[in-house]
């Protein structure tokens, strides 16, 4: 649950707020209810009273042109609708009746010198990230050739060793062991590392390694977009993998399908090279190049020509 006070504190660097009224309602919650960030804050709108209401110059001019009785009526509609906070943009001064109403009903009233349109944009970006669906996944998250790659698999398969090999080849570490993912946009999942584990990689026999100190600043990343999941599995006689799968394998992550590659762990296999190859192939597919599809077309043409 996000409160008005948290919103003010988290945006103190970009949006300087000044409390005008409703100081006792700092813990007032901003309702989420699964709504998009665009629906949680916007210009004054009586049809959507339950969002953070922003008064710009036009909205304040609209409000002040009415008599006191009409203003009270509009404020009652907002209050009944459960308005979480009222923000005055552009450094505007609040009318005394608005201050009195907010104090009486304990609704936070704040002002800021930031322009109304910019204020709404900043808060929508903030709310979109703050209230995004999140999950924590066990694995290692890396930047491989500019692509966010999550390495998963059961314990003891060498995920951290593989990550260390990739880092030594010039790729970057985002998070190890516990990776926090959030769906920050309808078609985008971002992954980052918890503050406690930043820059750290745990390798059996070596313990904790500070990757940033060992390999330098360019060896770590703050966050990446998830594009590929590489799942490591033990190589057993019972496993039967399709050598040429006709359909891409995907895994659901926060409601989005993410491309997935299965790699068998066996003696003599260079997994780092295989991961790089999988990433390069994924990049080609994102560009619309389907190697298997082109091969099947070539094969079909060869069969057609040989049958003539």
From Swiss-Prot:
For the protein in the UniProt heading, the enzyme class is transferase
Recorded catalytic reaction(s): these are: [HPr protein]-L-serine + ATP = [HPr protein]-O-phospho-L-serine + ADP + H(+); [HPr protein]-O-phospho-L-serine + phosphate + H(+) = [HPr protein]-L-serine + diphosphate
Give the molecular function GO annotations.
ATP binding; magnesium ion binding; phosphorelay sensor kinase activity; protein serine/threonine kinase activity; protein serine/threonine/tyrosine kinase activity
Leader peptide range in chain numbering:
none
Cofactor(s) annotated in UniProt: Mg(2+)
**Superkingdom assignment:** Bacteria
- The entry's Mg(2+)-binding residues are 160, 202
Question: Which Pfam families does the entry link to?
Answer: Hpr_kinase_C, Hpr_kinase_N
Q: Which UniProt keywords apply?
A: ATP-binding, Kinase, Magnesium, Metal-binding, Multifunctional enzyme, Nucleotide-binding, Serine/threonine-protein kinase, Transferase
In which residues is ATP bound? 153-160
List every stretch annotated Important for the catalytic mechanism of both phosphorylation and dephosphorylation. Answer: 201-210
Specify whether Phosphoprotein is a keyword of the entry.
Answer: no
Active site residues per record: 138, 159, 177 (proton acceptor), 243
- Its job: Catalyzes the ATP- as well as the pyrophosphate-dependent phosphorylation of a specific serine residue in HPr, a phosphocarrier protein of the phosphoenolpyruvate-dependent sugar phosphotransferase system (PTS). HprK/P also catalyzes the pyrophosphate-producing, inorganic phosphate-dependent dephosphorylation (phosphorolysis) of seryl-phosphorylated HPr (P-Ser-HPr).
Query: What's the entry's take on its domains?
Result: The Walker A ATP-binding motif also binds Pi and PPi.
Q: What else is known?
A: Both phosphorylation and phosphorolysis are carried out by the same active site and suggest a common mechanism for both reactions.
Q: Which family does it belong to?
A: Belongs to the HPrK/P family.
**Protein name, please?**
HPr kinase/phosphorylase
Can you name the source organism? Bordetella avium (strain 197N)
């Amino acid at each position: 649950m996000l409160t008005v006070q948290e919103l003010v504190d988290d945006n103190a660097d970009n949006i300087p707020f000044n409390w005008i009224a409703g100081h006792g309602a700092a813990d007032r919650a901003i309702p989420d209810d699964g709504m998009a960030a665009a629906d949680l804050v916007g210009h004054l709108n009586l049809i959507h009273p339950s969002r953070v209401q922003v008064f710009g110059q036009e909205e304040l001019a609209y409000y002040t042109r009415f008599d006191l009785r009409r203003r009270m009526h509009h404020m009652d509609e907002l209050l009944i609708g459960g308005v979480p906070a009222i923000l005055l943009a552009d450094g505007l001064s609040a009318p005394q009746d608005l201050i009195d109403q907010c104090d009486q009903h304990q609704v936070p009233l704040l002002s800021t010198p930031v322009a109304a349109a910019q204020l709404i944009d900043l808060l929508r970006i903030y709310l979109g990230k703050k209230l995004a669906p999140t999950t924590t996944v066990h694995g290692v998250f890396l930047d491989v050739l500019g692509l966010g790659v999550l390495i998963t698999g059961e314990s003891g398969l060498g995920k951290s060793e593989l990550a260390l090999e990739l880092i030594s080849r010039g790729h970057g570490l985002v998070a190890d062991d516990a990776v926090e993912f959030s769906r920050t946009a309808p078609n985008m999942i971002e992954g980052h590392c918890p503050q406690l584990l930043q820059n750290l990689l745990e390798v059996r026999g070596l313990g904790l390694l500070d990757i940033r100190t060992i390999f330098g600043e360019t060896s770590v990343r703050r966050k990446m977009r998830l594009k590929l999941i590489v799942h490591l599995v033990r190589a057993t006689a019972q496993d039967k993998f399709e050598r040429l799968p006709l359909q891409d394998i995907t895994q659901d992550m926060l409601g989005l399908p993410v491309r997935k590659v299965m790699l068998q762990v066996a003696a003599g296999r260079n997994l780092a090279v295989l991961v790089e190859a999988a990433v390069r192939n994924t990049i080609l597919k994102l560009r619309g190049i389907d190697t298997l599809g082109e091969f099947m077309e070539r094969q079909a043409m060869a069969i057609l020509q040989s049958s003539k």
